[in-house]
């Protein structure tokens, strides 16, 4: 449980000498459901001197980054509480405006591509319309606003056949249906340009010798 016994005791004013007769069960329930993690509560008096409290807590689905703030969210997108420690570090990270409301639905769409989903370190919402995937090796996959299954299928095929997600790639742009753009990392781009220049120089030299 994320809600501590101390929080419950303090909120209900229980100090070991509180009279059960004086305890208002309905008022106690209303107070407890105001705690950030509490979804529902069952509370009853067990005479002569016991109060039984059963809490149903909200379930954290992910971490939502909005600006500089980090919050824990439910599947519905509702904010539970600010992120305070590392115990939830394994939860998926969603970034940007409206990312929290579309998080669960979007992740569900990736269920058929676990080899991609398992490599995602952050789901970034762009302009409230589409998503970028930030992978564990720094590659950014820019997904389209529509036709998401087709884009993911293409990405999976490119990785299977060309190992595109294991190369010196900075970004894979799948936003357009008629073309895929692959942006190399700065180092890879420089090496490629050096190779092109060398080949061009060699061709010119060969032409002079003929």
UniProtKB/Swiss-Prot annotation:
It is a single-pass type II membrane protein. Residues 1-58 form the POTRA domain. The keyword Aminoacyl-tRNA synthetase does not apply. GO terms for biological process: cell septum assembly. Gene3D superfamilies: Cell division protein FtsQ/DivIB (3.40.50.11690), membrane protein fhac (3.10.20.310). The keyword Cell membrane applies. It is found in: Cell inner membrane. Essential cell division protein. Belongs to the FtsQ/DivIB family. FtsQ subfamily. This is Cell division protein FtsQ. The gene is ftsQ.
């Amino acid at each position: 449980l994320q809600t501590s016994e101390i929080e419950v005791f303090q909120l209900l004013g229980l100090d070991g000498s509180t009279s059960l007769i004086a305890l208002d069960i309905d008022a106690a329930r209303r107070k407890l459901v105001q705690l950030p993690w509490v979804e529902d509560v069952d509370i009853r008096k067990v005479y002569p001197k016991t109060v039984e409290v059963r809490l149903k807590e909200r379930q954290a689905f992910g971490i939502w980054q909005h600006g500089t703030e980090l919050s824990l969210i439910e599947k519905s997108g509702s904010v539970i509480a600010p992120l305070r420690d590392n115990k939830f570090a394994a939860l998926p990270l969603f970034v940007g405006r409206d990312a929290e409301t579309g998080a669960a639905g979007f992740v569900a769409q990736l269920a058929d591509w676990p080899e991609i989903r398992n490599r995602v370190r952050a789901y970034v919402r762009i302009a409230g319309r589409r998503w970028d995937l930030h992978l564990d090796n720094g590659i950014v996959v820019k997904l389209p606003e529509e036709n998401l299954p087709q884009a993911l299928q293409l990405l999976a095929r490119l990785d299977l056949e060309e190992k595109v997600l294991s190369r010196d790639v900075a970004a894979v742009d799948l936003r357009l249906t008629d073309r895929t753009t692959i942006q190399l990392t700065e180092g890879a781009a420089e090496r490629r340009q050096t190779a092109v220049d060398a080949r061009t120089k060699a061709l010119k030299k060969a032409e002079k010798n003929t």
